[in-house]
Amino acid sequence: MRFSIISASLVLIFANVKAFNEEEILEIFCGVPKKLVSRYNQCLIDHGPEIIKKNYEIINSCMKGHLGSETESAMEYVCNKKNVDISIKRCISDKISEEMKEFDRRARLEVWDVLYVCIFKA
């Protein structure tokens, strides 16, 4: 569950920046130590805005049936290239893109504030 929140926040960051392709995003994400991911996830759960929670629900719905209940199993699924299912990627991408259309500038700034706190001060 927590994995989904970090995924959603990373999608938000990289969707806004558009500086990285999918492969580079995956490489960055999969290089993060699991302990740090857990700490970051908890910070987002505690401080995250509504859009993070919506994206978390989207990712959960798209990956339903492919994951166990632990963060590690989710990371292993996503980071193992053998498990990449294009339909899951497409589901997440399409639904989050749709959600972002209604995401105003003020809400984007709120996400950046929370991400900054969770990355640098947690």
From Swiss-Prot:
Q: Name one GO cellular component term.
A: extracellular region
Q: In which tissues is it expressed?
A: Expressed by the venom gland.
Coiled coil stretches, renumbered: none
Principal localisation: secreted
Q: Which residues form the signal peptide?
A: 1-19
- Which keywords accompany this UniProt record? Disulfide bond, Secreted, Signal
Which modifications occur after translation, per UniProt? Answer: Contains 3 disulfide bonds.
Compartments where located: Secreted
UniProt name for this protein = Venom protein 7.1
